[in-house]
Each structure stands twice: as C-alpha cells, then as structure tokens.
C-alpha cells in the first residue's frame, strides 16, 4: 500500500515538474511572441477552446489578449491576427515575410506540400505563376470564359425548370453547375449532370470540405499526429480525398496517352507540355505529383466556395424577401427577360452587386483563412515571430469589423451602398484573402457569382417551406470553413 502511495506521489511530482518545465520553455522560446493563454503539455490550449465554434473561441480570446495573440492548438503554436488593421499589416504591408503557407492538417494528409495551394517557396511561386498564366490562356477573365459560364447557366435553368416547383435540396444542382466551369478548363470538357462518377466526385468534395468545419475536424487540426492512426470521421475524409486524387490521376494518364504538344486541350495538357520542356532541369517543379495536386487544388477550390456561397445566398434571400424583390426589380429593369445576363451588366446594377457582396461577407466561407507561415524571423508590431511561425489571418474578423460595417452581424446590403444607392467598395471585403497568397481564382469566382446569381433570379423566385421568420440563417458549422444549414426550397418560374 505504502509503495503504491509513493509511486502515485512520484508520478504527480514528475507531472508537475513537466508542466512547469513546459511553461518555462514556452516562455523562454517565445521571447517577444504575442501574449496568449498558457498552454499545457501536448494539449496546448485545448481546454480553452470550443471545437464546435473554433472561430468564436479564438475571437473571445482576442477580447482578453488583443488583436494579435498566440494560441496552442495541441502542440502546434499559432499566432492569430484579428481585425482589418492586423491582417492588412501582415498580409499586405509585410507581404513577403507572411507569404509562407501554414498547415491545414486534413488537406496536408493528401497534398503533403505539393500543388499550388499548400506549397511553399520556389515551388509555390512557379506553380502559381504557371497556373495564373494558363488559366488566362484558357479564357479566364475574358469573353471566352463568360460564354462558358452563360452556357452552363442555361443548363442549370433547364434542370431547375425540370423540378416543376417541387421542394428540392439545391446543393448538387449548384455544385454540378459551378464545377463544370472549372472542369471545362482543367479537363477540357463538362460533365453530364447525371454522370454517376461526377456526382460521386462532388459528394467526396463536399464531404471532405464539411469535415474541416466540424468539431472532429478542428480536433484533427490539433492532434493530427495521433488521430490519423485512429478510427473516426477523419478516415472517411481521407478516403474521399484519396478518391479525388485517384480520379485526377486517371485523367492525367488519359491526357498523357493522347497528348498533342502543339495543341493543348486543357490545363492538364499545358502542364504536361511544360513537363516535357523542363525534363532536363534538375530543379524543375513541373512533374506528375505537382500536376495531380495542382489540378485537384483548382478543381476543389473552383467548385466548393462558389457553390456554397450561392447556397447560403438563396437561404438569406428567403429570409429577406424584400431583398429578393429589389433584386428582381433591378434585373427586370436593366436586363429584362429576353436575354441572358452579361458580366458588364453589373456596372448598372448596384443593388444586385451589393447583395452578392453582402452574401459573401455574411457567408464568410473561410473565416480563419488558409494558414500562413512567416518564412524568416519577422518583427511584427512590438513582437518577434521566429521563422516558421504559423499565422491565422482571421478573415471573418475583417468581414465583421464594426469600423467598416455598421451592423456586422446582420445581413444588410446597405453595407455596400452609398447614400445615393450606388455600389461602394470596402477595404474590409476580403473573402478571397489579400497579399501574395490571395486567391488567384477571384476574377473567375466573381464572374460566376454574378452570372449564375442573376440568371437564376431572372428566371425564378424562391419559396421556402418555412415562413421567413422561422428560417435559421446561422451556420451549421464554423471551423476552417463556414457551412450553411441543409435546407430545401422551390424554384418557381417567374
């Protein structure tokens, strides 16, 4: 009995020493790191965080420690930036220092630093430069891609008319349409809406994207080194990501067999041609792994964010029928009902433009942004960030900065209108991030949002099975991503 008591006392003493040593080490190594709650060994600040509402947890901590603070997600140390000023100072004013890519544990399981989105250094620069130039070559930002979006919008209108006003979940109607635009660029063709493989891909994308926003997804961000070996929802997310990689790899193999170097059909062909041109360059970043992962980056990003924004937007308009009515009025007055909307119409449609911006602001698809990393020892404000320090630029805190938006928690298109009813830009509108790692698909996404949104609203009015006052527009999950609640609606022809 005495021996077991002594053993217990010894264990408790050892644990106490470990905790004290950990705190001392953290403080010593931190130097002038931003302040933050004291972490415990291995679990970090887990006990102070609500993994169901990670964004809100971090914002609550900022109330105590200020707009720049340090948090420990398990053993992972992260500096968090809140509000317009802190985010802009880091990502724009000190753009080079903050241009590294941090960890996103779920996606890192697959990408492992390859591809344009999650790479660093010279690899990121080369792949980004190539991707921007190649997308432009295939019409992004030009009339060519606008015609492709208009064509796809026509297919969507036909599909929605085919529902005959029945109550439907719009999720896959929207994701099929949006995905087909990026598919035509990276794969050279669109998918049929009933293609089973296509629908399976969309489910995989949606499943893995939604996992990152769940409580388990946030836990995985903290304890990935352990959880990747355990059963749980993360294993299903890995399975979905692997399925997406396998699909892309199969597409690449087909293009390799049928490649004509003088006539590239799509993004994959263009990358394969660049691989041939650089095959004698020992430092090339143009090889199969980067091709597969970059293509998957484009396919994923080009589908989920725009389709989820539209899905959130329709829910908000059913909650606010007076906004829907004003958009209908502006569409009828500027475009009419006898021609398709064009991107140039937006210059004459300030209210619709304000509504789309407010949907993006309120929807806040990536509230914590993609993690950044400082690529050298960096002085930021009065703090010192050692090389490799991870940084969360809280984009949601910029989109809700009360200095820029009078009622940031409310959906209100007036946030983007001046006193004369004209559209007004805002420096705090950052859904595509800012700085050197801004989303280079921003131009394509803006065009898609405007053309799909106006074409759908030109042809339909929305009806919810619930009355407006009963519609819940709070998100289902807010983690890495913001996911709107599942809902059904009717598209009633106008």
From Swiss-Prot:
Transmembrane segments: none annotated. Its EC number is 1.14.14.1. It catalyses: an organic molecule + reduced [NADPH--hemoprotein reductase] + O2 = an alcohol + oxidized [NADPH--hemoprotein reductase] + H2O + H(+). Exhibits a coumarin 7-hydroxylase activity. Active in the metabolic activation of hexamethylphosphoramide, N,N-dimethylaniline, 2'-methoxyacetophenone, N-nitrosomethylphenylamine, and the tobacco-specific carcinogen, 4-(methylnitrosamino)-1-(3-pyridyl)-1-butanone. Possesses phenacetin O-deethylation activity. GO terms for molecular function: arachidonate epoxygenase activity; coumarin 7-hydroxylase activity; heme binding; iron ion binding; monooxygenase activity; oxidoreductase activity, acting on paired donors, with incorporation or reduction of molecular oxygen, reduced flavin or flavoprotein as one donor, and incorporation of one atom of oxygen. Its cofactor is heme. Changing residue 158 to E: In allele CYP2A13*3 and allele CYP2A13*8. This is Cytochrome P450 2A13. It is found in: Endoplasmic reticulum membrane; Microsome membrane. Heme binds at residue 439. Gene3D superfamilies: Cytochrome P450. Changing residue 257 to C: In allele CYP2A13*2. The gene is CYP2A13. The lineage of its organism: Eukaryota, Metazoa, Chordata, Craniata, Vertebrata. Belongs to the cytochrome P450 family. GO terms for biological process: aflatoxin metabolic process; coumarin metabolic process; epoxygenase P450 pathway; xenobiotic metabolic process. It comes from Homo sapiens. Keywords: Endoplasmic reticulum, Heme, Iron, Membrane, Metal-binding, Microsome, Monooxygenase, Oxidoreductase. SUPFAM superfamilies: Cytochrome P450 (SSF48264).
């Amino acid at each position: 009995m005495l021996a077991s008591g002594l053993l217990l006392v010894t264990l408790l003493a050892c644990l106490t020493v470990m905790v004290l040593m950990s705190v001392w080490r953290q403080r010593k190594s931190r130097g002038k790191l931003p302040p933050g709650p004291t972490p415990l060994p291995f679990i970090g600040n887990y006990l102070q965080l609500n993994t169901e509402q990670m964004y809100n947890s971090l914002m609550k901590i900022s109330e105590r420690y200020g707009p720049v603070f340090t948090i420990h997600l398990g053993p992972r140390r992260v500096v968090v930036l809140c509000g317009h000023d802190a985010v802009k100072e880091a990502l724009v004013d000190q753009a080079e220092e903050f241009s590294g890519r941090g960890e996103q544990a779920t996606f890192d399981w697959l990408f492992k630093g390859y591809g344009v989105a999650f790479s660093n250094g010279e690899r990121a620069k080369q792949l980004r430069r190539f991707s921007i130039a190649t997308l432009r070559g295939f019409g992004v930002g030009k009339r060519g891609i606008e015609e492709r979006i208009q064509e796809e919008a026509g297919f969507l209108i036909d599909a929605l008319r085919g529902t005959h006003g029945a109550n439907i979940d719009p999720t896959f109607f929207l994701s099929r349409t949006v995905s087909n635009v990026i598919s035509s660029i990276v794969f050279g063709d669109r998918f049929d809406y009933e293609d089973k493989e296509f629908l399976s891909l969309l489910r995989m994308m949606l499943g893995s994207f939604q996992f990152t926003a769940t409580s388990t997804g946030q836990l995985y961000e903290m304890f990935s080194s352990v959880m990747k070996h355990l059963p749980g929802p993360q294993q299903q997310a890995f399975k979905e990501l692997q399925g997406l990689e396998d699909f892309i790899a199969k597409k690449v193999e087909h293009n390799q067999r049928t490649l004509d170097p003088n006539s590239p059909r799509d993004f994959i062909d263009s990358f394969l041609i660049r691989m041939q041109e650089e095959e004698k360059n020992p430092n090339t970043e143009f090889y199969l792994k980067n091709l597969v992962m970059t293509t998957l980056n484009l396919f994923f990003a080009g589908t989920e964010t725009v389709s989820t924004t539209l899905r959130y937007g329709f829910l908000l308009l059913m909650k606010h029928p007076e906004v829907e009515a004003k958009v209908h009025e502006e569409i009828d007055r500027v475009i009419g009902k006898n021609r398709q909307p064009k991107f140039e119409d937006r210059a004459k449609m300030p209210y619709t433009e304000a509504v789309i911006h407010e949907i993006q602001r309120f929807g806040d698809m990536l509230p914590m942004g993609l993690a950044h990393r400082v690529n050298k020892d960096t002085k930021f404000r009065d703090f010192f960030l050692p090389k490799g320090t991870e940084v969360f630029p809280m984009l949601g805190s910029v989109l809700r900065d009360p200095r820029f938006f009078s009622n940031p928690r409310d959906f209100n298109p007036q946030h983007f209108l001046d006193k004369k009813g004209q559209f007004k830009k805002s420096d705090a509108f950052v859904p595509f991030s800012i700085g050197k790692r801004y989303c280079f698909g921003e131009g394509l996404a803006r065009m898609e949002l405007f053309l799909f949104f106006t074409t759908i609203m030109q042809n339909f009015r929305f009806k919810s099975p619930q009355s407006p006052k009963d519609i819940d527009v709070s998100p289902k999950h807010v983690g890495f991503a913001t996911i709107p609640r599942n809902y059904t609606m009717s598209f009633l022809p106008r």
